[in-house]
A protein has these predicted regions:
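Flexible, compositionally biased loop and terminal segments
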Residues: 1-228
Length: 228
C-alpha cells in the first residue's frame, strides 16, 4: 500500500488526502480479491518505522484507520470477510485496539475470506518477538532447542494461523520488500508496479494476477522435474 503521500504531493494535496484515497483503494482491492477467488489478502497498513513520521500525520492515520474499521464493519460482515491483525497490536492507541478487537470478534466466525491487516508490523521485529517467545518456552522446558525446525518457529510468528503468501504486490515503483513478511515470502512471487496505491484498482489487481498465473513456481526444482 505504497505511494499515498506521493499521490497527494503530485496533486498539490495534503498527504492525509492521499491516505484517504488509499483507504478507498483498500475497498477496491477487497472487492477484486473476492471476485477473483483470492481467499486471503494481507495489507501492509502501518509499519513499525511509520512511527517516525510527523506526529500530526501519524495521528491522522490512526483516526483514518478507526473510521475505516467503523465504516467497513457492516461490509465485512455482509461479505463474510474475517479481519485478522498481524503486528505489535498492544502498542497501538487504546481506542484503535478496542476497535480492532471489536471487528475481529464480529468477523471471527467467517472462514472463506480473510483480510489480514499488518499494523505496527515489521518482519525483523516479528523474528525477534518469535525468538524471544521460543527462548522463554525453552527455558520453561516446553521446547527442545535441538529439535527446533522452521515449522515450529513459524508457530511463534504473528502469522502463525495464516498460510505463506503466493504473491506479493509492491506498488509505487519501489523494488524492495520494506521489511514485509520476509520469512513468509521466501517463495512468493513478487510483482512490482509503478502505479501508486490510490490508483491501484480492479484492473491493476487483475493484471497482477495474470502476471502471476504465467509464472512457473519451482521451489528449488528444475523445470524438467516439474514437468514430470
Amino acid at each position: 500500500m505504497d505511494g499515498n503521500g506521493r499521490w497527494a504531493n503530485e496533486r498539490g494535496l495534503p498527504r492525509i488526502e492521499g491516505h484517504r484515497r488509499g483507504a478507498d483503494a483498500v475497498k477496491r482491492a477487497l472487492k477484486a480479491a473476492q471476485e477473483n477467488g483470492v481467499k486471503i489478502i494481507t495489507l501492509y497498513a502501518f509499519s513499525v518505522e511509520n512511527w517516525n513520521r510527523p506526529k500530526d500525520e501519524v495521528d491522522a492515520l490512526m483516526q483514518l484507520l478507526d473510521r475505516f474499521l467503523k465504516d467497513q464493519l457492516t461490509e465485512l460482515v455482509k461479505r463474510k470477510i474475517r479481519l485478522r491483525v498481524v503486528g505489535r497490536y498492544q502498542e497501538l492507541p487504546e481506542h484503535i485496539r478496542e476497535r480492532l478487537s471489536h471487528v475481529e470478534a464480529a468477523t471471527a466466525k467467517f472462514t472463506d475470506y480473510t483480510l489480514a491487516l499488518a499494523l505496527n508490523y515489521g518482519a525483523r521485529t516479528e523474528v525477534v518477538d518469535a525468538a524471544r517467545a521460543i527462548a522463554q518456552a525453552a527455558q520453561a522446558g516446553k521446547i527442545n532447542p535441538d529439535e527446533l525446525d522452521y515449522e515450529q518457529f513459524a508457530q511463534h510468528l504473528y502469522t502463525k494461523d495464516l498460510p505463506d503468501p503466493d504473491l506479493v504486490i509492491r506498488t509505487s515503483g519501489e523494488a524492495r520488500l520494506s521489511n514485509f513478511l520476509l520469512l513468509q515470502a521466501a517463495y512468493a512471487e513478487i510483482y512490482f508496479t509503478p502505479v501508486l496505491w490510490p490508483d491501484f484498482d480492479e484492473k491493476q489487481f487483475k493484471l497482477a494476477l495474470t502476471d502471476y498465473a504465467a509464472r512457473e513456481r519451482r521451489y528449488g526444482q528444475t523445470a524438467e522435474q516439474l514437468q514430470g
